[in-house]
Structures are given as structure tokens and as C-alpha cells.
Amino acid sequence: MSMIDEPLYPIAVLIDELKNDDIQLRLNSIRRLSTIARALGEERTRKELIPFLSENNDDDDEVLLAMAEELGVFIPYVGGVEYAHVLLPPLETLSTVEETCVREKAVESLCRVGSQMRESDLVDHFISLVKRLAAGEWFTARVSACGVFHIAYPSAPDMLKTELRSLYTQLCQDDMPMVRRAAATNLGKFAATVESAHLKTDVMSMFEDLTQDDQDSVRLLAVEGCAALGKLLEPQDCVQHILPVIVNFSQDKSWRVRYMVANQLYELCEAVGPEPTRTELVPAYVRLLRDNEAEVRIAAAGKVTKFCRILNPEIAIQHILPCVKELSSDSSQHVRSALASVIMGMAPVLGKDATIEHLLPIFLSLLKDEFPDVRLNIISKLDQVNQVIGIDLLSQSLLPAIVELAEDRHWRVRLAIIEYIPLLASQLGVGFFDDKLGALCMQWLQDKVHSIRDAAANNLKRLAEEFGPEWAMQHIVPQVLEMVNNPHYLYRMTILRAVSLLAPVMGSEITCSKLLPVVMTASKDRVPNIKFNVAKVLQSLIPIVDQSVVEKTIRPGLVELSEDPDVDVRFFANQALQSIDNVMMSS
């Protein structure tokens, strides 16, 4: 092929591949657009490639999605920002297709391209695109239009700004609910670009239209707009325009709208300020906490700590706590679970006395809840309460419940308790721990569930680190070594695991005198799984013990295992022997 023809080659391949029946080839060629554009050069990309893409009416959504994505980053390949406008026609076409994800990606790319365009080009090219989309015959075009107003508006001259505001008003009143939903979703972004004088008039009237929409799917999106608009308005305007809407929404006939209010209420409080929150929004929140729809109560319960943080403790105790008490015995387990996941955070907000008087009884009732997730959510946050009421009170009031949960029938609850033990141990101190929790830690090593046994072995290591090797030598090692003769091989394996974890904490001397002999005895076990685990443990002990011990005790044991009839035992024994040789060579 001659040099002259070479630049033609990629575009020819591309056009062939773009028309190919095989979707994978079409996709690959779209994803290589930037490479092809570089080969063509900026001018030919503008004059040949982009028009070709504009006319390309591929019917496969995956190909169109890839094209919408590529065009968003295409400015460098068409000659920079001064030519960015040539990318608008193909993106405009893509923003009117039927498939939602393609339209959304095209709108995202339009915004990306538009935000880099020069002001004069925005006025000449981008604003006319917005107007065409907003007046589109198909609802898909009008839906996409809503997402690009905030890019077009700031650089528009005053006359055009007025026109754009009136177009957006029309979209808020469109016949199709899909368009009104898009208008509600994007109102906050558009409002952020509108001058404050028009914000109070035009934008607020659009907002009011949306809040009174007969479709709940539109109203619930308007709820999100409340928080966004609230942040743009002065506090007094916010109280005048936004607050009544929120209060109405909190009593909306559709539970989905009330659910959105419950989810957004914290942000709305920030917008209106502390005083209106106390007088208007606390009653609204209380209504949501007592809503007859469980989904709404779940959303409201999950925000209870956040909401209390912006109130003073007296108001929280007076108005919110009675609802929290009711929710702790709610008929829906999911409501109780949502409450349990955040209620511990209320302790620092309410302070020590109120926590002891009001919250502790609620914690206790949730710790005894029949639904395991509720119990789990309380256990995992106990440290937040400990910081407020102190360990003495925590141990008197909650510890009996914790001990009970250590034998819970749901293994995940037992697991959460085990993971909490080292923290509890460090706070309770060694004396208290030995009295109340020591026996439990041993009991878990013989649990029916493997994850519990594994966590129990890890727990012993963390306790040995917390209280030191001497304490471990007295309270952990003898009990662990006693269990090594358990008739069930799975429990014997747990003990080997515990030994391998304890050895680095206990140090060389105790490992050689107490732990290693037990491992060597286990190497004579009749169960192959035990023997290959012995090989793994011996490998982990090599760096801990002296070289002489490795040669005198560990190597002979491994050599014996390497001649075992079982293939896995031989494999792990040889791996450990290899490890010894490597250590020898490096030293």
C-alpha cells in the first residue's frame, strides 16, 4: 500500500467494521475511535468521522452507549475547544434514543463538552440544541433537555435566559410524567445557576408546580429538590417557601413521598436553621417515626441519631425519646434493626444521665431481640456507650446480656461477640476478664461452626497481645493444650491453628518448651488433615525458634511427614522443608 493511501486505511476499516453484522466488531471499532481520530488528523475527524457518526443509526444500545461515552472525551481529537461544537450533533441524536442508559450517557457527555466550550460557541450552538431538545416531539428529547439547562444558562444573554426559564417551566408542566420527573431531578442543578432575583419567582413557581404534581413519583423527586433549593435561599425565604412544603410532604398520601422526607429531613433541617427545626420539623419527624408504613419508619429510625445531634438534649429527650422507645418494640424487625444500627450514637448526644435513665433499658431490650440482626447491630456499637457511661456501669447492666449472647443460637451473633471481646477485655481489665469471660473464650474453640472456632483462635492471640505472655501462659496455654486430645479431628485442627497464632506472641522459649511438643505429637495423628496442618504449623514456627531446634526437632518431623502415604501431607511437608532450606541458604 502506498504512503498516500495510508491515512485512508483506518477510516475504511472503521466504516467496514461499523457496518459489520458482528456487534463485537462494531463495539471494538467504536472503542478505538480516539486511535482512528489520531490517525485521521483533526480536520478529517471533523469533516468525515463526526458526520459519519451523526448519520450512524446503529440499533444496538451497547454500541450507542460506547459512542456516547467516547464522544464526551473527544474534544482534543477535533482540534480543541474552538471546534468542540462539532461534537454536538451526534450527541444530540444519541440523547433522543429510546434506551435510558444511552440518553443518560449522552447527556453526561453533552455536559462535559458544554462545560469546556467557549461562551460565544455556547450561545451560537449549545443553547439552540437545548431549545430543540426542549421542544422535541418525542418525550425522550424533552427528558434529556432537562439535564443540560444548567450548562447553557450561565452564558446566555438576558433575553435568552428569560426564554430558557420559561422553557424549563413548560417542562415542569409537561404532559408526560417522565419529563416532569427529569425536570424535578435536575431542578436543583438548574436553580444553582439562576440569579437570586429569579430564584424566588420563576424557580420557586416551578418548584411549587412539581410539589403539587398528581404523580407521587414526581413529588418524591421534588423532595430532593427541597434540600438543594433550601441551600440556595436565604434562611428567611427558606422558612417561607420550603418549610411549608416539607411539612405537607411529611403528611403526603403516598408513603414513598413520606419515605423520601424521612431520608432527607436531616439535610432539610440544616437548610432551615435551628429555630424552625424545633418548632416545625420536630413534630413532622415525630409523625414520620410513628408512620403507619414500616418503610417510612425504617428510614426515619435510621436518621434518629443524626436528627438528635441538631437538637438540644432536652428537646431530644422530650420529643424523640418516647418514639425511640416505641420503635424498640416495633412490630417490624427491620424497623428495630434500623434503630439498633444508630441508637448507640445517641448516648454521646444525650449525655451520661439520660443514657443511663432512658437509653440503657432500650439497649437491653434490643440486645434480647428475637431477630439476630437487631442484636448484632447493638453489639457492634457497644464502645460508643462505654465512652459515655463508663465500664463499671456497662459491665453491670449489659454484661449479663453479652454473656448470654455468647451462646446465641445464631452463629453470626456469637461471631460479633467474639470480635468484640478483645476491646471489652482491654476496657474491663485482666481481673474482671478472668472472672467473667475467660471460660467463654475456651468454650468457643469447640463451637460447631468453623468460622467461630477460627475467630476464637484469633481472639486468643489478641488477648495474649493485650495481657502479655505471662498471663497467657497461666490462663490460655494450659487450657488450649488440654484440648489437643479431643476425639474430634476438627477441634484438634482448631488447636493447631491457635498454637500457630500464639507462637509469635509467646516467643521462642515458651514455643519450644510448651507448644512445639504438642505439634510434634500431633504429627503422629491418624487423620491426614491433621498431619498436613502440622506441616503448615511447623513451617510457621521456623522463624520463631532457634536454628538448632529446627534441625533437631522440626526437620526430622517434616522428613517423616514427607514420606506419608497421603499426597497432601507429602506436599505440605516438602513445602516446609523447602522453607527450611531457603532460610539456611539466606543465613
Swiss-Prot record:
Disulfide bonds: none annotated. Ubiquitous, with higher levels in roots and flowers (at protein level). The keyword Zinc does not apply. GO terms for cellular component: cytosol; nucleus; peroxisome. The modification N-acetylserine is found at residue 2. It comes from the Eukaryota. Keywords: Acetylation, Cytoplasm, Nucleus, Peroxisome, Repeat. Transmembrane segments: none annotated. PP2A consists of a common heterodimeric core enzyme, composed of a 36 kDa catalytic subunit (subunit C) and a 65 kDa constant regulatory subunit (subunit A), that associates with a variety of regulatory subunits such as subunits B (the R2/B/PR55/B55, R3/B''/PR72/PR130/PR59 and R5/B'/B56 families). Interacts with B'THETA. Interacts with SRK2E/OST1. Interacts with SIC/RON3. The A subunit of protein phosphatase 2A serves as a scaffolding molecule to coordinate the assembly of the catalytic subunit and a variable regulatory B subunit. Involved during developmental process such as seedling and floral developments. Seems to act as a negative regulator of PP2A catalytic activity. Associates with the serine/threonine-protein phosphatase PP2A catalytic subunit C and regulatory subunit B' to positively regulates beta-oxidation of fatty acids and protoauxins in peroxisomes by dephosphorylating peroxisomal beta-oxidation-related proteins. Each HEAT repeat appears to consist of two alpha helices joined by a hydrophilic region, the intrarepeat loop. The repeat units may be arranged laterally to form a rod-like structure. This is Serine/threonine-protein phosphatase 2A 65 kDa regulatory subunit A beta isoform.
